[in-house]
Amino acid sequence: MLTNRQLLILQVIINDFIRSAQPVGSRTLSKKEDITFSSATIRNEMADLEELGFIEKTHSSSGRIPSEKGYRYYVDHLLSPRKLSSNELVLIQSAFQEKIFELEKTVQKSAEILSDLTNYTSIVLGPKLSENRLKQIQLVPVQPNKAVAIMITDSGHVENKTITFSEHLDVSDIEKLMNILNSRLAGVPMDQLKDRMYKEVVMLLRTHLKDYDHILDALGNTFTSTQNESKLFFGGKINMLNQPEFHDIDRIRSLMMLIEQKNDVMQLFHPNQQGITIKIGSENNLEAMENCSLITATYSIDQKSLGSIAVIGPTRMDYGRVVSLLHHVSKDLSNALSNLYDE
């Protein structure tokens, strides 16, 4: 259990290191308004904090820097969300006031806002395609027995699939098929298309098209292969180059390689998490993230979580400010998407 004096010294060390990226010595601490103890007392308390594992010494300086354990204690017990400036709030609100009719553009906008305001890297995990509904399907003949199905969702996502029919279909048959699919499947969730097709489309195919069973098989294969993965949106991919910790070429290379690997990035998100979570250094379970912290928030519609929005920064990131920014951006993103889905 830390004493009040140790808590104060730890908090001041971390706040100063977040601001300056320079190790903090007892002389620096003695000049702080909040610190009224003697230099000898400060040195003794710092020695105790180091022995307890909350701060550590660097090789190149006599000062101390926070350890991962120190950051975790700070986040869990000492952190207060930072009040955002009126300019920051206006920037966030104005970005979502712009009329955007596609989910993906709205989500990308939120990633860009966060990276601009934090100067860190932001990642938004978009909703799974199964959360989208089919808005329209277009069929474009490319060969006598082939057509490209262009599926457009209510989020603005576009997916192209090649349909191979066992028999030749003329243009009028393609048009009939397209009209039937749009009349019965528009508004249906993407992961329910195949089931709905066998329940509602099959009778119309039988009535209006010959060889309907072959057409049904071809459509079934197409809808089965529809992607169900979440899409990743990034903001400020190279922002970490501006952070002193990442002037080390090997360190920044590892992080850049991680960001380019979708499977690795997906490991940073947990499907059942709610609210705002903070993972520090090794807690991310990825070697490239050992010098980084990840703060994640969820966004939702009608209390149903759709995806996650995250900020990657150095372990000395400004936690209080980033937590506040994530809170506001995730809330405004949720409101913007609710309005989009209601239209």
UniProtKB/Swiss-Prot annotation:
HAMAP family (UniProt xref): HrcA
GO BP annotation list: negative regulation of DNA-templated transcription
Keywords: Repressor, Stress response, Transcription, Transcription regulation
Protein name per the record: Heat-inducible transcription repressor HrcA
Stretch forming the signal peptide: none
Pfam families per UniProt: HrcA (PF01628)
Primary gene name: hrcA
Family according to the record: Belongs to the HrcA family.
Molecular functions per Gene Ontology: DNA binding
Presence of keyword Repressor: yes
Purpose: Negative regulator of class I heat shock genes (grpE-dnaK-dnaJ and groELS operons). Prevents heat-shock induction of these operons.
InterPro entries per UniProt: GAF-like_dom_sf, HrcA, HrcA_C, WH-like_DNA-bd_sf, WH_DNA-bd_sf, WHTH_transcript_rep_HrcA_IDD
Keyword ATP-binding: no
Originating species: Bacillus pumilus (strain SAFR-032)
Record NCBIfam families: hrcA
